[in-house]
């Protein structure tokens, strides 16, 4: 059971540029701009990637788990006070590990925490994704502001 969202789908769309089928954050449970965010991604069988990954045994692709974590991280960096406005893009990953498969019906709980910000252009977050309290993916994600 999850708590009430602090940001709903409409509010998330106002903060992130992603749209269907690439909007991977369904609701935000905690959000402290410039510090941390906790969000939910509900994994459903009707998502387009499951048509081919894999038809007889659908698994959420690891790159989409990482992208979901990056979108939650983006909520931290893009909403920081006193930063120049612009588009923050995913710039790199370090130490990403996958611990178990994610399947339709799972609910990803994604937690991100800001580790560093350099020259008001480059951010790094620590990210973890869990399903029912079990770690499924973790790593550090980097962001860069593009003009």
UniProtKB/Swiss-Prot annotation:
Gene3D superfamilies: Hotdog Thioesterase. Pfam families: FabA (PF07977). The keyword Cytoplasm applies. CDD domains: FabZ. The active site is at 53. It is found in: Cytoplasm. It catalyses: a (3R)-hydroxyacyl-[ACP] = a (2E)-enoyl-[ACP] + H2O. One of its GO terms (cellular component) is membrane. Keywords: Cytoplasm, Lipid A biosynthesis, Lipid biosynthesis, Lipid metabolism, Lyase. It is an enzyme of class 4 (lyase). GO terms for molecular function: (3R)-hydroxyacyl-[acyl-carrier-protein] dehydratase activity. Its EC number is 4.2.1.59. It comes from the Bacteria. GO terms for biological process: fatty acid biosynthetic process; lipid A biosynthetic process. PANTHER family: 3-HYDROXYACYL-[ACYL-CARRIER-PROTEIN] DEHYDRATASE (PTHR30272:SF1). Involved in unsaturated fatty acids biosynthesis. Catalyzes the dehydration of short chain beta-hydroxyacyl-ACPs and long chain saturated and unsaturated beta-hydroxyacyl-ACPs. Belongs to the thioester dehydratase family. FabZ subfamily. NCBIfam families: fabZ, PRK00006.1. This is 3-hydroxyacyl-[acyl-carrier-protein] dehydratase FabZ. The lineage of its organism: Bacteria, Bacillati, Cyanobacteriota, Cyanophyceae, Synechococcales. The gene is fabZ.
């Amino acid at each position: 059971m999850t708590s009430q969202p602090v940001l709903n789908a409409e509010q998330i769309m106002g903060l992130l540029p992603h749209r269907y089928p690439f909007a991977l954050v369904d609701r935000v449970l905690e959000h402290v701009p410039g510090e941390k965010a906790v969000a939910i991604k509900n994994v459903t069988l009707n998502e387009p990637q499951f048509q081919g990954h894999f038809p007889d045994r659908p698994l959420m692709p690891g790159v989409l788990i990482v992208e979901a974590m990056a979108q939650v991280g983006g909520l931290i960096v893009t909403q920081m006070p006193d930063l120049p406005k612009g588009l923050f893009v995913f710039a790199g990953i370090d130490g990403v590990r996958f611990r178990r498969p994610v399947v339709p019906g799972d609910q990803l709980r994604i937690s991100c925490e800001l580790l560093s910000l350099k020259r008001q252009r480059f951010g790094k977050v620590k990210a973890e994704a869990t399903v029912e309290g079990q770690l499924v993916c973790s790593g550090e994600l980097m962001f860069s502001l593009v003009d």
